[in-house]
Amino acid sequence: IPLDTIAGYKE
């Protein structure tokens, strides 16, 4: 899973 999306941002 994309942990950066968990953090609340994903470009």
Swiss-Prot record:
The keyword Secreted applies. Keywords: Secreted. One of its GO terms (cellular component) is extracellular region. It is found in: Secreted. Transmembrane segments: none annotated. Expressed in placenta, specifically the maternal caruncula tissue (MCT) and the fetal cotyledonary tissue (FCT) (at protein level). Belongs to the fetuin family. This is Alpha-2-HS-glycoprotein. It comes from Dama dama (Fallow deer). The lineage of its organism: Eukaryota, Metazoa, Chordata, Craniata, Vertebrata.
